[in-house]
Amino acid sequence: MGKPLADYVKLPELEEYKEWFKDFADLYREDGILQVTWKTLDGPMHHSGMSHRAISQLVRVLSLDYKNEIIIFTHIGDHWMTESDPNGWETYSELPTQRFQHQYFDDTNLIKNMVFDLDVPTIGAIPGSGFHWDSAMLSDITICPEDTWMEVPHAHGGLVPGDGMGLMCQHYFGTKRGNYYMMTARQWTAQQMLDWGMVSEVLPKDQVMARAWEIARMWKTKPYENRTIMSNLAKRPLKKLLVEDLKLHTVSEQYGSLLRIAAGDMGDRNAAQQDEKYISQTNDWRYTFPHMQQAPTRESWAAFRTEPIEWFKKVEAGEAVNPCDPTRPVKPYRPDGE
């Protein structure tokens, strides 16, 4: 056999891109099964323009490494994402180019790369309550613990809920129920997610990660080619959904934000539309108290802008405990206690 004129392009190996993304994800691979644990530095992931972009970038890089045969997506600690970087949105606010790139490219890629770039089986392993659950719910199957509750929070803060979560609610819950939860910001529980088709299994909290690895190892017994083709069939309904509606949703959110900027009423918690860093102050409160699981009212919406701030003051004064405390030490899960 003769020698080809040019060889295959050398792409980065795991150890190299693991270093690239070390501030946003812990990557662990065993027997072709890759566990992606979202984080920021050594603690829980803090929502920011930078993490937004890093998620979509990492997913694209993972798709180029054929040694990643099955991928588990999870989050460090006992919750999904609950924190936000208060200084992580400065470039997001710069007009026109920076904001356009963040909202037109990053917001879309965050969703579509999970489905269109990854051709291998994926598992979303949710450790607990949180927001921006995109990568977990876009996985081929999703599992979560019994104490999980989630929501689409945008409407509370005056935003158009167009980053993809509302679209997935319509898809998984059905149009009317999805519209209701998207337009009211009411939270739903793990059992509701199971009943309505958003998750595949609900488990005791301490069994989620072990179960994710058990499923991945089960899939490994199936021929590589066949399980990969199987995964592409699993992704097809979401591919059709995203082709039809994703860009409309993301651009609608962007358009709504630009209108508020033009009107001069985007800003703090008293503005018509809250800036990202102000919305984020409410995150831990949302997953500490079950208020938002009740049918929302005008009064409860108004309280959303004041009660979390008062609660945080008590936490800072030592008069209340924050179960989502981002300063608690956490470590990524390892199978078999490694």
Where do the protein language model's features map onto the residues?
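C-terminal alpha-helix plus adjacent terminal tail
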Residues: M1-D31, T40, Y66, I76-T82, ...
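A short, well-ordered alpha-helical element
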Residues: F21-A25, H47-I71
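An acidic, glycine-rich surface segment that forms the CoA-thioester-binding/catalytic face
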Residues: R53-S56, R60-Y66, P86-G128, L167, ...
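Hydrophobic/aromatic residues within transmembrane alpha-helices
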Residues: F73, S135-M137, M193, A212
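Glycine-rich beta-to-alpha active-site loop
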Residues: H79, D107-P161
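Short acidic-hydrophobic, aromatic-tinged amphipathic segments that line or gate anion-handling sites
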Residues: I143-C144, V199-R211
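Hydrophobic, secondary-structure "cap" segments at the distal end of domains
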Residues: G166-K176
